[in-house]
Amino acid sequence: MGKGHEMKATSGVQGTLAPERLVGGLPTMYCFETCPFCFKVKALLGSRGIEYSKVEVDPTFKTQLKWSDWGKVPIYVDQDGTQVNDSNHILHYIDQKNGNLFPRAGEDMDQDHWMDFSNNVLGKSIVAVIYTTYWTSVGALDYVTRVDNFSRTSRLINKWVGAIIMRMVGKSRAKMFDLPPRENLQHQLDEMSKGIQGKFFGGLGPNGADFANYGILRSMQGLNGFDLVEGHAVISGWYN
């Protein structure tokens, strides 16, 4: 779907195919390396053993998304050119085509609730913790200095200017909750643990809520605040 298209881009499966956006003829995901929502999709693709290509998107300028009206990551382009926008929609699309092992949206209220929780609560909670200071923000964005398809200038801008931007984003996310960032994340992990039915949200096997929330927390690994995940009585066991 090009920039000149009159229809406003939406989440979910798009009506126009984009086969020219495939890399190496494989399903292709457009993503940021540390994006929590991209890690959801990576988790499911890895679990199903699906080979795919990845296009690393410049987080400041998003040059690699100029072709799409949808300016957010992740974007998933399947082998036939089908474009799917938004992480939870991508999870449902991939599962439906590869095993159909968990319910579709609207078929399981608990799964829907916890998948929404991953976007609306957990994803925002971890951003407030990761980007709590300028220097934790710089640390989280250090990966951009190692991305081959970014120019040297782009790498520097994304690391140093991007850290300022993400610190501001972290502040705005923190204001969404009553508790300070670390205490809030601890509280949300406690809340999340109530939805785990045995080993998984899905009971005996993982469902969409497992992949959605695991992906969010996986993006924190090695960054500020992950100790809360590792130290949680319920979530640490579920995560591992």
Language-model regions, residue ranges each:
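GST-like fold's C-terminal all-alpha helical module
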Residues: G123-V234
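Intrinsically disordered, low-complexity polar regions and short flexible loop motifs
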Residues: S236-N240
